[in-house]
């Protein structure tokens, strides 16, 4: 059985690393919570009023709500792992954090992949029978695909609660050349089971996202070149919109892949718990959902208008409270 063993002491992490990790990841998580919470509130209010949400808005509602839960959970995990290490390294607590983190991340990766597939089918233009078939069927199938994604995420996340992680704390490790002792945190990770369940849960949405993003970029680039050949000019608003969409899609394709890699490295304990590499993984994992939520607001005219109204109303509300 292939296992990865790590150990750490309280001396292995400096106050600077603790502060840096909490501040940077905290800013990212709070940004993501505000962005995801705003999108959830806008679409959730429409759904609560009995309105039928369009397919794209429905995907964004589920994606934003799951991200809201994810980033709250990530903040809690960072606080416990850095400030309450004895509690965090109890086996049941540690496994709970890991399993729910993987489940929420898998769900987010699925929802993000379906959103990219939906936009690709709606915007891109390819003369292929399969593409036309998917374009016609996607609206009917999407509610079932979203439900199936949650079930798949559950199926490949909760088995991680058995025979994958084992952590414990030894509070009586003798310090050489001293009569005192120190706490040492040990972790064991069954890499065979982790790699199997993690890859099974992430492989399909990762391939879907890469294919959909690549097809969307190719279609937009082809259309942009066509517009350029017709001498519409690089300053044309439509041309700028296409170039902006290509850049945004390329950026989040790269960040999506990095997020998937960072999640695996962080979960597998390949790096020491308090190493700079593990801290970098935590920062990347918090950056992707936060950045994508902000981009969704800025790139959606309806959400952008709602955000401007919100910004205008908050000062008025606060002013009324002080009177």
Swiss-Prot record:
What's an example of a GO molecular-function annotation for this chain? Answer: bitter taste receptor activity
Q: Which residues lie on this side of the membrane: Cytoplasmic?
A: 36-58, 122-140, 212-247, 298-323
Specify the superkingdom: Eukaryota
What positions does the record give for glycosylation?
Answer: 170, 179
Family to which this protein belongs: Belongs to the G-protein coupled receptor T2R family.
Instruction: Write down the CDD domains for this protein, in alphabetical order.
Output: 7tm_TAS2R40
Its encoding gene is what? TAS2R40
What biological function has been recorded for the protein in this entry?
Gustducin-coupled receptor implicated in the perception of bitter compounds in the oral cavity and the gastrointestinal tract. Signals through PLCB2 and the calcium-regulated cation channel TRPM5.
Q: What name goes with this protein? A: Taste receptor type 2 member 40
Which residues are on the Extracellular side of the membrane? Answer: 1-14, 80-100, 163-190, 269-276
Q: In which tissues is it expressed?
A: Expressed in subsets of taste receptor cells of the tongue and exclusively in gustducin-positive cells.
Write out the transmembrane intervals. Answer: 15-35, 59-79, 101-121, 141-162, 191-211, 248-268, 277-297
- Pfam families the record matches: TAS2R
* Extra information: Several bitter taste receptors are expressed in a single taste receptor cell.
InterPro entries, sorted = TAS2R
Bilayer topology reads: Multi-pass membrane protein
- Keyword annotations from UniProtKB, A to Z: G-protein coupled receptor, Glycoprotein, Membrane, Receptor, Sensory transduction, Taste, Transducer, Transmembrane, Transmembrane helix
A single GO BP term for this record reads: detection of chemical stimulus involved in sensory perception of bitter taste
Q: Where in the cell is it found?
A: Membrane
Provide GO CC annotations from the record.
membrane; plasma membrane
